[in-house]
Amino acid sequence: MDSTVTVSVRDARASDSDRLWIESVYRNYLDDLAPLNTGIFPVLGEVGHREPDQITRWFSDSTAFVLAIVKNSKPVGFAMVARGTSQPGRPPVDFRMAEFFIARSQRRLGIGRTAVQLIFNRFAGRWEITEYLRNPAAVSFWRRVVALYTQGNYQERIVNGEVRQMFQSGTAPRR
């Protein structure tokens, strides 16, 4: 990444323009997920599926943090960090990366890696990152950034077609 490029992460709830930007690129995010054909993500335009409803849920969920990923003061991506929930048979986690998106034109520039490091530092605790095994680009990205961030000190499991990385992040200065 160019050393003159500044990447930051900010609370998208604090800015109407960040929310509008996320709404404007949400369809691109769903397009990226569509080839996975998991059945979890509705087909665009499907009866009963309304994208604004999903975004409204994110912004009203008190257990989630909606973040704008910013390059040189302009949004280029978003992330949603969810508080972990205990699930039978799984180790407890404090945070999960529920959603993560970088605009296509901004990919492979180091922005995602930098944003992830900022997010992990901001939310100290036990993390779980989950990606579909059928999404090799996501698996490769998350393995690289988690290994770099943790210096290889993480656990990975493959369960039911999902790859899960679990690790401890650093001290959080603020949210």
Specify the residue positions occupied by each region the protein language model found:
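Conserved acetyl-CoA-binding loop-helix of GNAT-fold acetyltransferases
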Residues: 102, 108-121
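A short, internal acetyl-CoA/4′-phosphopantetheine-binding micro-motif in the GNAT/acyltransferase core
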Residues: 97-108, 131-133
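A conserved beta-turn-beta hairpin within the catalytic core of GNAT-like acetyltransferases
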Residues: 85-97, 125
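Conserved GNAT-fold acetyl-CoA-binding loop/helix
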Residues: 30-55
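Conserved beta-strand-loop-alpha-helix junction that forms the acyl-donor binding cleft
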Residues: 128-143, 147, 157-160
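A short helix-loop-beta-strand connector motif used in the catalytic cores of GNAT acetyltransferases and
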Residues: 50-68
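A short beta-loop-alpha structural element at the N-terminal edge
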Residues: 7-35
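Conserved beta-strand in the GNAT
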Residues: 68, 74-83, 96, 101
